Amino acid sequence: MNKNFTLLVSFILTFFISETSTAQSWEVYNTQLQLQSRLIYDEIDLLSETVRIGKRGNELSLLSNDFKPAVSLVGTEIYQYLEPWILVKGPNGIGAFHEYGQQVLPLEYEKIQTYFNMLLASKGNEYWLFQRGFNKTTYLGELDEAKITNTGLIIIRKGDEYSMPLSTNPDKTFELLSDNDGEFVLAKEPSGFGLINREGDYVLDPIIETLQHTHGNFYYGFNQDQYLLIEGNDIQSNIRYNSFHKITFENDIMLEYIHGKLRRVMEDDGILLDDVGMTKVEKVGKDLYNVYFRDEKVGLLGKKGWLVQPMLEVEEIKNGSEGLFPASSNGAFGFVNSAGTWVIPAQYAETTLFSENFAAYRNTHNWGVINSSGEQVANASWEEIKPFQKGLAIAKANGKYFLLNTFGTTLNTEGFDDIYRTTDGFFMVERSGKSGLLDSEAKEVIPTEFEGLRRERKDFVIVQKDGLTGVINETGEIIIPVAYEKILVDWANDKIFTKNSFTPTVIQIIEEPSKKNKRGA
């Protein structure tokens, strides 16, 4: 028996032991679905047209153009991508890489603020500044606050003192340095307020008694008994308007009073309206004002003048569309035109704007539809009606969504849990947790049987079903089988990535016994 067993072993040259482990395989196709390559990564992230990230286990890499690991990103996950900076998170904190692959900050910080050529990092109350132009990191110290402005200035605060460490005079302190959505920093010194440009230089000397930002590069101030409207400029700021009469700036409304009476509605750089008899002004939208007069007229004022001429028997006028403006009288809403004439009498509790000559209205909790002549198109039986686009509106009743045409007729008899309009006239629909697609005439092109659905472009719809992903066209024809864990599309580089799990076979070879063994050994 032993002899037979020995002979059997001698006839076996190799013995295979298979061990299994799970890995992730990616196939890369062009947009004509021709296979280009195969990759082994757990995850691939496309951060931009040129920045691609690959992950294998705990190893995170910046990939080359041929999708090979080019730079190890050290950390375990991408924290944020703010071009050109890749913020990477690791066990000890956040660090930063330039998208070209250079590591500029170790993974040890709690927060990192980014600008296109610099980074501001912090741990607790300690701050560091990396400047790409000098390729160096500078310790700024223990601070109460530090920030990068939208023009790239560094402002720091310690106690009640502010300074700019990158300016030509980094040791100079200020009582206040405040940035805004404009291009200038509001500065305060003992001598007064001024404005500082992106170079850190004064373009308005600090001599103004009071100064506050309004919008953009404009400021409202007071100095030597004069009210000032100032516009920032990179070389020298300009006083656009000045007056010894009182100018107020409250609730984002600027008004001028002459001898104690309201006379002018102001904009950032001067007079918007000069009229007598005004009693009050209320802001009703961006650059939109209801102006009230002593003779009980009300008008709607816009950036370029009257949108609705002052008129009687109105309490409020809202922004409008298609030449009609919602307006209220005695607590009810109707529509007026730009001449200040009632077109649709005030009879509704609430209205929407007109869209394609149709608007929604309600008198109770339910909404209906009227046309621009005030004729009822749809009864007030809807919980919600969204604006008409290309002849269709999305409407909700009894918790379900329907498509409503301009005759007030629903195009789908069975409601959906939700309907989303796409940019090119299609409709994504959901029912019982499944998604589908309707065309511009509300006809079903993809049935509501998918767990997820994303229309990338014409005839290319990424779908998920039973936990797997694929691509179909708008007639339901399969483009890529619904058999993958994930699909990524990089249209700019003509690439489609499909992810799949597979189980590789690892073969362990046991060599045959050596023929040189002595007999009987």
PLM regions with names:
Residues M1-S25:
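Bacterial Sec-dependent N-terminal signal peptides
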Residues Q24-A521:
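Residue-level detector of conserved, function-critical positions
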